[in-house]
Amino acid sequence: MTKNNNPNIVKNSLGYDSNLYIYQDKTMFNYSVDTILLANFVFINQKIKNILEIGTNNAALSIFLAERDEKLKIDALEIQEKAFKIAKMNVDYNEKNSQISLINADFNDFWKEKIKTSQMKYDSIVCNPPFFPIKNTKQSKKLTKEMLIATHEVKLTLENIIEGSAKIIEQKGYLTMVIPVERLVDCFFLLRKYKFEPKRVKFIIPRIYDKPKLVLVEARYQAGWGVHFLPNIYLHDSENKHIHIYREEVKKLYKPIRKKEK
């Protein structure tokens, strides 16, 4: 077991009833339901062999994805050195080193270097992006520098992600993200701009009478038109906003959905 004397670092289970655990720093961005829902929304089949995660943070998403298919090879990219070190701790602890390669780099530099040095392109790219525009956001004094970079477009914008992904993804490769509903129009516009076609869209809604807050989006590079709006995910049954028990449907998604073998 990995030892750490930092009081801000805690060990949490990753999903329900699984053998996966991760260390998280309470002063940094921590995984939540959107991480899990995104990990199980990512399309995986026999043809998907290599995946890039942009902004892995503590590697929760990549570890969950690796558990879905033991043959997957994942490059997990993280710009923040502090988060990168925690990600390494988590990959080591969950024994995923044979599947996950951690890369401490800025995505804007990474994709430019990759097209110079490697002909290999990714079958799939996944990202839980820093989605708040920095100029339009009133910043809380409680927000640490690490959390600001993880949640706001300080180092990386939505357009950076989509533009760079187009350079290093296979034709008809999958780009999958979770974003706030407010950014959906921006997302569709940018996807089309860089030759991606939205294919699957799924809204995440806290309760049945609430507005959607997040949306899962899958797009494919240089693919034909045609988008499918899938049934919504409702997180909680109760209208009482003080009750936060997940619905059974959501609990089932808290376990890695393994790739079906032929």
Regions found by a protein language model. Name each.
Residues Y21-Y23, T27, Y31, V154-P212:
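Conserved Class I SAM-dependent methyltransferase catalytic core
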Residues P129-N160:
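Mobile active-site "lid"/loop adjacent to the S-adenosyl-L-methionine
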Residues M1-S18, E113-M120, I257-K262:
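Short, Lys/Arg-enriched, disordered terminal segments
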Residues L38, N128, I161, A219:
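Residue-level signal for inorganic ion chemistry
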Residues K211-K262:
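SAM/dcSAM-binding transferase cores
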Residues V42-S118, S124-C127, P133-K138, E163:
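Conserved SAM/SAH cofactor-binding pocket of Class I
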Residues L20, K49, L72, S98-I100, ...:
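A structural micro-motif
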Residues K3-N45:
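Class I SAM-dependent transferase core
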